[in-house]
Each structure stands twice: as C-alpha cells, then as structure tokens.
Amino acid sequence: MKALVLHGKHQIQIEHDFPEPPLGPDCVKIAVSYCGLCGTDIHKYEGKGGSRPVVYPVPLGHEASGIVVETGKQVRDLKAGDRVAVDPNWYCKSCWFCQNGLTHFCENSRGVVKGFAEYICPPRENVYKLPDSLSLRDAALAEPLSCCLHGMDLLDLKTGQTVVIIGLGSIGSIFLQLCRRAGAARCIVVEPQEQKRGLGMRLGASLCLN
C-alpha cells in the first residue's frame, strides 16, 4: 500500500509497497479518507520521542477517518461501506492500569494507528460509525475533539467566567469554540502568530494578544 513513512529524523518519504497491516479477527480494515497532522507527528519528524520511543520505519498520522473495507471474523456490527472514525490508541486491556481505567498509562500499548497510509486495521472497539450528518473530513477531528472535551471536564467551566487560551493550534482552536459554547463571558487568546490571532477573532475570541 501507499504510505508516508518516517525512517528517522527528517527522513520521510512516500512509499508505494509498504506492507498492509494484518486484519485480526476482532479488527476492522479501513480505507483512510482523511488524517489530521498532529503535533506529535511533528515531534517524531524532529526526532523527538513521545511517551514511547519511535520505532522506524513507521507511517505517521493517527487522527483518521475512513470507510470500512473488510471486517474480521468476530466483527458483526460493521460492514464494508460504513463510514467511521477511529480512536487511535491501542491498549492491552490486561495490565493493572487498563484494569483500573487508566488506559493512558498502559504498560503494553501497541501504539497508535498509522493514518498516513491507505489502510489501517484497528480493533473493533476503537472504531465508531458516523452519522450521515457528519462528513469524513470533519470526523478526522474526533480524536483531538475528544481530548478537548476531557479537558473541559477537568476545567469545570462556570457560566460567566473568563478563560485564557495560550496557543491557537488545532487544540487551542477547538478549546476556544467549546469555551464559548459552555458560557464563558470572555475568551482571551495568547498567540504569537498574527494569522492565528485573526483566526481567533473569527472564532469568537474576546481579545487576542501577542
């Protein structure tokens, strides 16, 4: 399959014969339609590891949406042609952390889906069927949106409060919109790039500072 593959720091190329991921009995083969570019991808490109070392060669990308091509033998509730979004994180489900609801600390994580490729094969439990009203393009933002929604839960924003958002990348942009919808009286953005400050004002920021 075709994939955008990272071979090392600043060593990235499009390959046309990268091996397709195997389809396990509880997995779903998806033809990727859209995949977002995350800050984590940039860090890997720059040779910086995240929570785990980067093992080369590896396709980047994990904020993916697409169309089901095939399902494993144990999957009964999805079929070819279904439009889906993906939770990119694969957990072992057996370590102490997974058993106690702390999957983000999984000791045996299989990593994340590799969305800058033609196909991915995540477990069924990581695949979410999309409503007809949601485009595949927008659905690629499901993973960063879920991160922001968790942040909103932790923030416990009250109507009428003022919020300061530092940085207006994709996460900051989503937070700005969520805070406005949650009833923040003022949303102040701190962002060094003029173009992004303009975006902040268009998204409803009360004030954008350099």
Regions found by a protein language model. Give the residues of each.
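Short N-terminal binding/cap micro-motifs at the start of the first secondary-structure element
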Residues: 10-15, 39-40
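NAD(P)H dinucleotide-binding glycine-rich loop of Rossmann-like/cofactor-binding domains
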Residues: 90-166
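Mid-domain Rossmann-like dinucleotide-binding core that forms the NAD(H)/NADP(H) cofactor-binding site
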Residues: 135-210
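Cytochrome P450 core scaffold surrounding the K-helix E-X-X-R motif
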Residues: 40-46
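Residues that mark the start of a beta-strand
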Residues: 2, 27-29, 162
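Glycine-rich beta-strand-centered segment in the early N-terminal region that forms part
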Residues: 20-35, 49-96, 131-134
